[in-house]
Amino acid sequence: MDRRITTRIVTAGCFALLTCWAVPLTAQQQGKGAAGSTNSSYEAYVPDTVSPEAQQVLRMMTGPQGLPLPEPNDIEGWKKIRNYVPPQLKEIAKNSEISKRTSDAIKRYPSTSKEGNLGGVPVVEIASEKWQDNRKVLVYVHGGGYVTGGPDFGLGGWVSGETGLRIISVGYTLAPEAKWDRITDQVVSVLHALEEEGYPPKNIAVLGDSAGGGLAAGAVLKMRDKGLGIPGALVLWSPWSDITETGDTYVTLKRADPLLNYKLLLKKAADAYADPKDQKNPYVSPVYGDYSKGFPPTLIQGGTKDIFLSNCVREYRAIDSAGGTAVLDIYEGMPHVFQGIVFGAPETQQSMAKMKQFLATYLGR
């Protein structure tokens, strides 16, 4: 298989949180000397109500497994695990059917990328080769639990091609090298720099997945509170909108989520990002924000196999109950940030069509 395709599958599958430390195991590998600890209470179930493509990927996931994680403020410890790519994810990439779906999508939207700097923050600019300048832009805020990941957006060309937008992917400083306040300010700086370059706020959209979803929403709240222009639209994929273990599905989906486990994977990452006393600050956990003062139209997408489902619902309710415009778009049987996990499946295509329609409706108004 083309090495470029393998790389794209791995980065697409990793961009949310799988980059280092949420490792799906095949049934044969589970319990046979795999590194790290596993969620032994995981109850595998592949519903027949999802697409065959999604069923294929879900069968390859048998529960969260994590590397032994550093203590929250161990900077060198976190650095050491960031370049780890799970061998199990490489195996998924080698699957001929999955690789063909990814290859077909990549070939449909070849793209270019270049590194840059906006507002003193590293960024990567990504655009489909068919992109034409329409003075609109999509700012992408990556996931990875705030402690992993980077601005190399595995789905960037596809998203650019589908939406017709140039993408600016933010290379914010990872925790614990920086804490939430500095990281949030970096996202604000990028958005403000685009305004200074002549982009009206109404022509700027923001996409954030997982931790990046929480960060994107928190940054927009901070922009509003500082009196800066707020973006025209916001899209959140499985947002980590409450980094404390608060919410129904942290408990009720604990055994059903094939990727995430709070105690095993998320707690130390949350503490690396924000001290416990700050974790319900609205800029850290935006479900606690005051949305009555204004907020962009927001599309929230998630799945029913994700412990962040309550984060999706609570974020939606916070915006909607304050009179804001919000759309909650939930997909049957889908795991955390499924757009990068079941890439090429009908569910991902449907979610992208919904996002495309949403941005066309609200961006530039």
What kind of feature is each model-predicted range?
Residues I81-G116:
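A domain-start/cap signature at the N-terminus of enzymes
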Residues A22-Q29:
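Boundary at the C-terminal end of the N-terminal hydrophobic targeting segment
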Residues Q29-S41, Y45-I81, K107-R365:
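Alpha/beta-hydrolase superfamily serine-hydrolase fold, recognizing
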Residues D2-G13:
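Bacterial N-terminal signal peptides that target proteins for export
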